[in-house]
Amino acid sequence: MELVLKDAQSALEVSETTFGRDFNEALVHQVVVAYAANARQGTRAQKTRAEVTGSGKKPWRQKGTGRARAGSVKGPIWRGGGVTFAAKTQDHSQKVNKKMYRGALKSIFSELVRQERLVVVESFGVEAPKTKELKAKLKAMNLEDVLIVTAEVDENLFLAARNLYKVDVRDVAGLDPVSLIAFNTVLVTADAVKQIEEMLA
């Protein structure tokens, strides 16, 4: 299959297994959920009534004071007491096989092509790290909410995009499924397309 280059009167021959396969929604969902879960720290921790510091002595006698009965100063209803269902540190990570991860990325790229949200260009960059220059360039291409994917990290492009809302720059190695589906349009250079094919082969 072929992908038309937006800035040139030519097309790029690409693999149908990478850019023309059926969309596997269940697989993409599983990989995206796993990716988000793997980003969680899981380091929060609270103390139960058994773990907080405090005396084990009964605060006052059971009967005769007129006050509500109390057996411990560490109970959850007391200030400084333990938490009823205390959060504990836990590992939220989910294992995703390489084959599944690659399959999900192929599915996403294929769906982007089908929905005409993948824009391929011969090359893309800015001469200086100027946000104004990049904004004008994107406006000329009628692009706003866009992920720019290049073969290698372009520092000028990265710095120019840093202060633009809904614009991000990644190299092929830094791609992830969440970023690919988060933007309306994905702008990819021809060199990056070849790298993507090699990575997902």
Swiss-Prot record:
Which controlled-vocabulary keywords does the entry list? Answer: Ribonucleoprotein, Ribosomal protein, RNA-binding, rRNA-binding
User: Which GO cellular component term is one of those annotated?
Assistant: ribosome
**Where is the stretch described as Disordered?**
45-72
- Tell me the SUPFAM superfamilies matching this sequence: Ribosomal protein L4
GO molecular function terms here?
rRNA binding; structural constituent of ribosome
Tell me the Gene Ontology biological-process terms attached to this UniProt entry. translation
Name the InterPro entries for this protein.
Ribosomal_uL4, Ribosomal_uL4-like, Ribosomal_uL4_dom_sf
Question: What is the similarity comment for this entry?
Answer: Belongs to the universal ribosomal protein uL4 family.
- Provide the function of this protein: One of the primary rRNA binding proteins, this protein initially binds near the 5'-end of the 23S rRNA. It is important during the early stages of 50S assembly. It makes multiple contacts with different domains of the 23S rRNA in the assembled 50S subunit and ribosome. Forms part of the polypeptide exit tunnel.
Matching entries from NCBIfam families are given as:
rplD_bact (TIGR03953)
Q: What PANTHER family does the annotation carry?
A: 50S RIBOSOMAL PROTEIN L4, LARGE RIBOSOMAL SUBUNIT PROTEIN UL4M
Q: How does it assemble?
A: Part of the 50S ribosomal subunit.
Q: What is this protein called?
A: Large ribosomal subunit protein uL4
